[in-house]
A protein has these predicted regions:
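Short helices/loops that flank or line small-molecule/ion binding pockets
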Residues: 18-19, 35-43, 122-140, 264, ...
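Extracytoplasmic/periplasmic substrate-recognition and gating elements
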Residues: 21-22, 145, 151-216
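Periplasmic solute-binding protein
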Residues: 3-26, 31-34, 45, 51-82, ...
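Short, solvent-exposed loop/beta-turn-alpha elements that line the ligand-binding surface or hinge
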Residues: 56, 71-96, 152-155, 167-176, ...
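Short amphipathic alpha-helical coupling segments at ligand-binding clamshell hinges
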Residues: 93-100, 189-200, 205-209, 231, ...
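Conserved C-terminal helix/tail region of periplasmic/extracytoplasmic solute-binding proteins
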Residues: 20, 44, 239-290
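A local structural motif
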Residues: 22-25, 105-123, 135-136, 153-159
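Glycine-centered hinge/linker elements that transmit conformational signals in sensory
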Residues: 37-39, 83-118, 165
Length: 290
């Protein structure tokens, strides 16, 4: 098995011009991000664009928020127990993380269109608020794939940039990163297959892809200069600088939960259902398939 490509989800996208015009600085901790959110709202700006819409998959963007927050409020071991259901979904620590997400998403002053728009805004349309004049929002938390849905002609590093979704300094949990990856598996043990898999572990193999764009490697031995853009070099620094890396939790859960009750539960949450009731319902769905 060889993991040859990863995506980073622990990102916040923003317009450098909007930040400069308003005197905002990149937050280095979650406490600073919370304070920045409050300041933006008090300045009359809308801090966040959040959209959970995705057709039959509506709700998944909120599961990413939850996973990132779990990694920032509790240890990696707790995250792993949550994902495997060794720790029940309705554990108080999970409910706490959901309410941290709610502190951003359930405040009408913090979200473009107000809380009522969170569940109905398509995730592909959500970041467009960064680029309107005046801007409809100042920040958008989403993975490294989202530039594919930015307005045509948007220049990364100029019109838009990103920063690491920061950790709580008070929690002392380092720099956790949430992501996903492509895993290659050999289906036979032929010599040529074995040699190819070995080759994919070498920096040279990764560097051949890096220059083509759209490829992010976790390999620490590559020459970052081989990336096609500064943006990808920045993503590489976030990825390889992680003190903890965890795969998307919902992707690791049984489909009935991770691509079912977890998605719909987060929609219920932003539509007014309590975190405890949502967590209880998700746990019940997990119990039903055991």
């Amino acid at each position: 098995m060889c993991i040859r490509d990863r995506s980073v989800k622990s990102l916040v996208w923003y317009s450098p011009d909007n930040f400069e015009d308003n005197g905002y600085e990149i937050p280095q901790t979650m406490e600073e991000l919370v304070s920045l959110t409050e300041k933006m709202a008090s300045d009359g700006n809308t801090p966040w664009c959040i959209g959970l819409g995705s057709g039959g998959a509506t709700g998944w963007p909120a599961t990413d928020w939850m996973e990132d927050i779990m990694l920032r409020t509790h240890s990696p071991d707790v995250y792993d127990m949550w994902v495997s259901n060794e720790m029940p979904f309705n554990d108080p620590r999970v409910i706490e993380a959901m309410d941290v997400f709610g502190s951003f998403a359930l405040n009408d002053k913090y979200v473009s269109g107000g809380t009522k728009a969170v569940a109905t805004t398509d995730f592909r349309d959500s970041p467009k608020g960064l680029f309107t004049s005046p801007p409809k929002c100042m920040m958008h938390r989403q993975a490294s794939f989202i530039p594919a849905f930015f307005p045509e002609g948007t220049k990364a590093g100029e019109d838009v940039d990103f920063f690491y979704f920061p950790a709580f300094s008070s929690k002392d949990l380092g720099r956790p990163v949430l992501g996903a990856g492509t895993v290659l598996t050999a289906t036979n043990n032929k010599p040529a297959t074995t040699e190819f898999m070995k080759f994919l572990m070498h920096p040279e193999a990764h560097e051949r892809f890096m220059g083509k764009g759209g490829f992010l490697t976790p390999h620490t031995g590559v020459d970052k200069g081989k990336y096609a853009s500064d943006s990808f070099r920045g993503l590489h620094d976030i990825l390889t600088g992680a003190t903890t890396f965890r795969f998307d939790g919902s992707d690791l859960m049984p489909g009935a939960v991770g691509a079912g009750s977890f998605w719909t539960g987060m929609v219920d949450y932003v539509n007014g259902k309590s975190a405890k009731d949502v967590a209880d319902a998700i746990q019940a769905s997990w119990d039903a398939i055991k």
